[in-house]
A protein has these predicted regions:
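Structured alpha/beta or helical-core interaction and ligand-binding surfaces enriched in interleaved
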Residues: 1-161
Length: 161
């Protein structure tokens, strides 16, 4: 069965709703994640500490769908992954102060473009600089999310799947 594709805008979602969405994805089978870290001009102590905490949960790189790609770069590409667990979710919450549904950045710990996978397939992902994300769900899951008042849209400019 083909998943239903829905979108969400950071304008409609609070940081708390974003974290609730991550927990919801984990409770519905999401098992790993990727993210992008920007380092300028050198890696900060906070960045090193963040990745040191995640290292315990790292998985082998695998080909995964990425929503953000440079011109000429494939959407399906080798991706650094971590297991999505209660512990890694807590690390993300503690470290990513503004949350992942924000286009605000912390220069010392500049994280963006969280992507969450279920059995290797993208379930939820954001493109931070485009102010939104995508969901790939079953009809029942979409109904459940809507019942929880999570705001979804038909489309978001510059984000597609």
């Amino acid at each position: 069965m083909q998943p239903i594709i829905r979108y969400f805008s950071f304008d409609d979602v609070t940081a708390s709703q974003g974290w609730d969405l991550l927990s919801w994805c984990r409770s519905h089978g999401a098992d790993d994640f990727s993210l992008t870290a920007l380092v300028s001009p050198v890696e900060s102590g906070r960045m090193k500490a963040f990745f040191a905490r995640l290292d315990v949960y790292s998985k082998s790189n695998a080909v995964r769908h990425q929503l953000a790609a440079a011109p000429g770069e494939a959407a399906q590409r080798d991706t650094r992954l971590w297991r999505l667990t209660e512990q890694t979710e807590a690390i993300l919450r503690e470290s990513w102060g503004v949350g992942f549904v924000s286009n605000e950045y912390d220069v010392d710990l500049w994280l963006e473009d969280l992507a969450v996978y279920r059995a290797g397939d993208l379930m939820m992902g954001v493109v931070s600089h485009e102010n939104g994300g995508v969901l790939r769900l079953t009809e029942l899951e979409l109904s459940e999310l809507r019942h929880s008042s999570f705001p979804d849209r038909d489309s978001i400019p510059w984000i597609g799947f």
